[in-house]
Each structure stands twice: as C-alpha cells, then as structure tokens.
C-alpha cells in the first residue's frame, strides 16, 4: 500500500483554517466581508472576551436560500466566481469559498439566515466541522452568524492568542477600517454592554472621518480631493505615438488606457505617529497592507518628516479590477499591482502636490534691535519649562520635606527675555580673505618656537568616567541650544533639551515609585474624543495614567474628561501627550511589558516638559542643569536613546592644533 493518502475533509479544513483564521479578528474580517458582499446596509458586531468566547455578526443583507446555506460550508463553494476568467476581474471582497468551512472547523458555529425568496429561514449548527443540526426557523431577512469557543479544538493555536484587550483592539481596528471604506453603511461594534463604535450612514467621507475620529483629528487632516491619472496601454504591435493619434481621431468605445483615481485624507508633516497603525489603505473598497503604497506615501513626505515617523493617512484607490491581483494570500490583504511603478509615482506625486498646496504661507516679522522697557519681562514662547519650575518651587515651599532626596536644589529659574536674540550664524556667506601680514618679529618667533611642542607628560589621561560631569564649568551656549562646558579633561558640548529630559525622566520615575507625583488641577476639565482602538487602550492603562499624575474618567461614549495632569506638563501639551501615551500603549500591547509602558509614559512627560532648543539660559541655570545631570543614573543618553553630550579631550584638542 502506498504512503501517500488523501487527507479527510476535517483535517484539511483545520489546515486551511491555519491560514484563513489566525486570530479572532480574522473571523470578524471574513464574516464582515461576506455581509458587505451580501448588500448589507447595517452591520452589527458583538464580541466577548476579545472574541475567544463569542463573535456574532448581524446584517440585513439578502440572506441565503436553504440549499445555498448548506453548500456554503463545503470547501471552495462560492457564488462569486464561475470560471478562471473571473479571477482577473474580482469585484467582491470574498471569493475563495474558504472562510465558512475554515471557521466552522475550529469553533462552534451557528448560522441563521433567510432569503426574502423563501417564507422561512434556515438554522444550521456546526461544531468542529461536524454538522449537528439543520432546521427551518422563523427568521427575519438577513444573516446572523454566531461563533463560540474559537480554537476550542486546537489548543496550540488558542495558547498563542494574545490578551483580551489586544485581540479586542485588533477587532476594533478592523471594524473601523471597513466603516471608513463604506460611509453609506451603518456599523456597530460592542463588547458586553459597552459600545466601542457606532456610526450611521453619511453622505461624505469627511462626515465619516468625523464620526470615527472626532473633530480634533479631522482638523489636523488635509483632504486630497479627487486625483486622477490615465495609463495609456497601446496594442503591442502599434507604436505608442501612432496609437495615441488613432485614439484621438477615432475615439473608440473601449479606450486603450486605464484610469487610476485617488481620494482620501492625510496629515500635515508636523503631525507624526510612531508606527503605521494610523495609515489606512483601500483598493476598490478592499482593506490592504501593501509595501508599494506605503513606500509611495513615505516618499511623498521625504525631507518633510523624520524617517522614523509616520503620517496619519486615509487613502482610497480606485482602478480597473484587472490592474490588481487580490488572489495572492488567503487573507486577501496582500495584493499585487500590474503596473506598480506607475501607481507608485501617481500616489507619491498626488500627495506631494497636495502637501505643497496646503502648506501655510510664511510670515515674517522684524526683529527689534532692543527690547523696550515694557517688554523686558515678556515670557519666551516656550514657557512650559518656567511653568514647570514655578510649579516645582511652589510645591517645594509647601512641602516640609524635599520631593526627592539626594537631588541638587533647583535654582530660582524664571526664563524671561532680557535682550534681543543673538543673530544666528550664517554659513552660506562667502569666506573672508585676509591679506597676509608682515612676518612675525624675532621675539614672537622665539615664543612660537618655545611653545610649538606641548610636553606629553603635562597632558592628563582622558577621564571618561561619568563623575567628570560634576566638575564641568559652563562657558556659554551655541545657538541657545547647546551648552559649552570645560572640564578637567577638555571640552564638553551638552544638548540642553535632552539633558533636561533625562533629569525630569528620573525625577518622574522616582516620584511615581514613591507615590508622590505632583499634579495640577485644570480650571475646566478637558474633554477628549477617542477612537474605538484608543478607548480600548485607555481602559487598559487608566490605572497607569492615574499613577503617573493624570486624573481622567469616562465621559460619555468614546470620550474622556481630564481633570488633572502632572505639574510638569503644560496645558498646551496635555492633549498631545495623552494621545501620544495612547499610541505608546498600542505599541506596548504587543510585548505585554508593563514596565516598558510605565517608562515610556514617564519619558513622554519628560520630553514635553523639558526645555527646548533656541532657549537662552544664564550661567546659573546652566550650572544647575550640569549638576543635576551628573546626579542622574544615566547621564549620557536621554530616555529615547539619543546622546546627551559630546566630549573632546585635551589630547584631541592639542592634536588637532598640531601641538602633539
């Protein structure tokens, strides 16, 4: 007897389910696409325990006949394809006929459906790929699919599922994607009694963006409008110039070109995200993740945004179905474009042109030669540093004991503009040629000869220990951004922003560990509107926010009220830092590291509260900054890994001047 045998259908379905059903969000995706293909105008998604215990999809589509409902659980049974030619022009979201049998093989599935062509509906129950019952039922029009105990018979796959909030966030992201792609339909997502997303049909994409993300995000976006570009496709046997001339003269019914159409929204360069989770890409209404489109988007922001940052973007591409191959992977999120190079340039150019059109016109104001007496006390634009210092001074005066023991006392900081800003150096000016002077006198020559060589024994050995920072003596600033300091061995250049960021980071960490984070109450609560994913992240990290000095509470559907914040955070930065922390929480959900989340929250607070570049400091402030930096545990890098100081030893300086 031969060794090769055909696998039973139950085993084959479980193998296929490994590609189609990766996690609960995969089940929601397949069933949601079936609902949209069925012409549903209202889709409701209900989940429990992150989709492990329950996933229910309810739609008002045209439903299925009894025979179709039974046949739908057979492998590769579909109503969307007839022959191989149909693969070249797929217009539906689903087409492979693998979703229902794959889902039914790894769960307990209940299908309830009724077509308006039949007087009664059909109820089918399947567990682990085995049909338990099939009966008639009194049902309304549409389809309800209930999936329970996902992966109950595949323990290995169930073991590798993430936490419930993580799986729920993936489901929320998926439903959010499809609600954006179909603004003319109603979507609802709920987990238990909590509704995470609820949108009604609207007339425009702009209204749907407002429903999903709120006015705060919408105000930061730029609408692309309608961008179109035609790709001319002459017959292979006809030269392009001749084909164009024939087309213009005859205007055939089937023109030899393909039209690409791009609409959507994108953020301005100053709105930066730390990951690609805020990039939504759709092709003919289908959610995709494509490297070609992502590269075109990043190319549009070239030199406008750091390479490590990503924009917020909603891109909707429409093209001929023959221009895109969606039959690449069972998940159908990976596609291939027939003319990828043309599409890449079209997307890049469209976004780049719109970016240039939407940029604000520059304004110039004359720089006063001297500050009038009435403006001597005008506060600098970057006032969060002085505000933070004033808060710390006030809190320190009210407390009987110091906030953190062992830290250097903070001086009386009050950053005020006392003189006009120092003109920036202009390196674009041509060099000044200096005419050669008379040769040095004999006396000067003898002095040069005598000091031309520096004795090596007089050069101290380089001391790279961190204790050398405590002996630094500030000399001044470069561009009011970098502190120049002299030490026992050479010269130091310190980035004042990242140095202060390191100091505040360790202060916030220690205050948080001691349970004594200084907070300030807001005069009026700040109301923030969250997306469905952000609402899940907020519920997961609400306790961490409270421990870090933020007093927040739910305030209606997908909104929170902020009543207090850490004293180091200025009111103007509060909204941005909270959204930044929620974005950090979304990233940390993949690692499930609570300690990393806490450190990243403290790092965000420190970064926003630290002094900025282009801020003048007097010597007293510089001295305090250097002393406080030397007292930190890691004074050579900021919490995000950037270097704080550069060191040029005496030996390196002498060697550069050819003294040794």
UniProtKB/Swiss-Prot annotation:
Gene3D superfamilies: 3.30.230.10, Histidine kinase-like ATPase, C-terminal domain, MutL, C-terminal domain, dimerisation subdomain, MutL, C-terminal domain, regulatory subdomain. GO terms for molecular function: ATP binding; ATP hydrolysis activity; ATP-dependent DNA damage sensor activity; mismatched DNA binding. It holds the Pfam family DNA_mis_repair. Transmembrane segments: none annotated. The keyword Zinc-finger does not apply. GO terms for biological process: mismatch repair. GO terms for cellular component: mismatch repair complex. This protein is involved in the repair of mismatches in DNA. It is required for dam-dependent methyl-directed DNA mismatch repair. May act as a 'molecular matchmaker', a protein that promotes the formation of a stable complex between two or more DNA-binding proteins in an ATP-dependent manner without itself being part of a final effector complex. The keyword DNA-binding does not apply. Belongs to the DNA mismatch repair MutL/HexB family. This is DNA mismatch repair protein MutL. Keywords: DNA damage, DNA repair.
């Amino acid at each position: 007897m031969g060794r090769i045998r055909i696998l039973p259908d139950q085993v084959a379905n479980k193998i296929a389910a490994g590609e189609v059903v990766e996690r609960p969000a995969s089940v929601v995706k397949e069933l949601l696409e079936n609902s949209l293909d069925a012409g549903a105008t209202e889709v409701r998604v209900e989940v429990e325990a992150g989709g492990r215990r329950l996933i229910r999809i309810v739609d008002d589509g045209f439903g299925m006949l009894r025979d179709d409902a039974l046949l739908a659980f057979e492998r590769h049974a579909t109503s969307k394809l007839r022959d191989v030619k149909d693969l070249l022009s797929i217009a539906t979201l689903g087409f492979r006929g693998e979703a229902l049998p794959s889902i039914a093989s790894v769960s307990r599935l209940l299908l309830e459906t009724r077509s308006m062509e039949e007087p009664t509906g059909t109820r089918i129950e399947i567990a682990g790929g085995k049909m338990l019952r099939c009966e008639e039922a009194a049902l309304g029009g549409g389809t309800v699919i209930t999936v329970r105990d996902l992966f109950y018979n595949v323990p290995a796959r169930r073991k590798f599922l993430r936490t419930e909030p993580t799986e729920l966030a993936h489901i929320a992201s998926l439903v959010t994607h499809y609600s954006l792609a179909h603004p003319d339909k109603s979507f609802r997502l709920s987990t238990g009694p909590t509704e995470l997303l609820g949108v009604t049909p609207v007339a425009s994409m702009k209204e749907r963006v407002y429903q999903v993300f709120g006015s705060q995000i919408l105000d930061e976006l730029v609408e692309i409008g309608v961008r179109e570009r035609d790709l001319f496709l002459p017959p292979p046997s006809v030269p392009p110039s001749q084909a164009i001339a024939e087309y213009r003269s005859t205007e055939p019914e089937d023109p030899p070109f393909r039209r690409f159409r791009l609409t959507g929204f994108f953020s301005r360069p100053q709105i930066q995200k730390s990951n690609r989770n805020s990039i939504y890409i759709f092709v003919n209404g289908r959610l995709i993740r494509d490297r070609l489109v992502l590269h075109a988007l990043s190319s549009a922001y070239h030199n406008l945004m750091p390479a490590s940052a990503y924009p917020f973007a909603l891109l909707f591409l429409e093209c001929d179905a023959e221009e895109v191959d969606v039959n690449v992977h069972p998940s159908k999120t990976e596609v291939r474009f027939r003319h990828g190079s043309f599409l890449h340039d079209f997307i890049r150019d469209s976004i780049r042109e719109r970016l240039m059109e939407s940029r604000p016109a520059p304004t110039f104001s004359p720089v006063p030669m001297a500050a009038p007496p009435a403006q001597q006390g005008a506060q600098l634009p970057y006032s969060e540093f002085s505000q933070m210092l004033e808060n710390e001074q006030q809190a320190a005066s009210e407390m009987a004991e110091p906030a953190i023991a062992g830290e250097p006392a903070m001086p009386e900081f009050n950053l005020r503009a006392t003189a006009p800003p120092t003109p920036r150096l202009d390196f674009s000016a041509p060099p000044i040629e200096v005419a050669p002077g008379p040769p040095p006198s004999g006396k000067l020559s003898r002095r040069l000869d005598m000091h031309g060589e520096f004795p090596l024994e007089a050069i101290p050995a380089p001391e790279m220990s961190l204790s050398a920072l405590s002996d630094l003596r500030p000399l001044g600033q470069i561009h009011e951004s970098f502190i120049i300091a002299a030490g026992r061995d050479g010269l130091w250049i310190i980035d004042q922003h990242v140095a202060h960021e390191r100091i505040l980071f360790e202060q916030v960490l220690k205050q948080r560990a001691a349970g004594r984070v200084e907070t300030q109450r807001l005069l009026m609560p700040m109301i923030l509107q969250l997306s469905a994913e952000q609402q899940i992240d907020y519920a997961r990290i609400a306790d961490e926010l409270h421990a870090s000095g933020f007093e927040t509470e739910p305030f209606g559907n997908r909104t929170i009220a902020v009543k207090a914040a850490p004293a180091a955070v200025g009111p103007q930065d509060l909204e941005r830092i909270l959204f930044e922390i929620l974005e950090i929480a979304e990233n940390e959900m993949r690692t499930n590291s609570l300690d990393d989340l806490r450190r990243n929250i403290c790092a965000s607070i420190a970064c926003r509260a630290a002094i900025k570049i282009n801020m003048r400091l007097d010597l007293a402030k510089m001295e305090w900054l250097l002393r406080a930096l030397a007292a930190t545990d890691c004074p050579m890098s900021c919490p995000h890994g950037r270097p704080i100081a550069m060191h040029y030893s005496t030996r390196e300086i002498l060697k550069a001047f050819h003294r040794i």
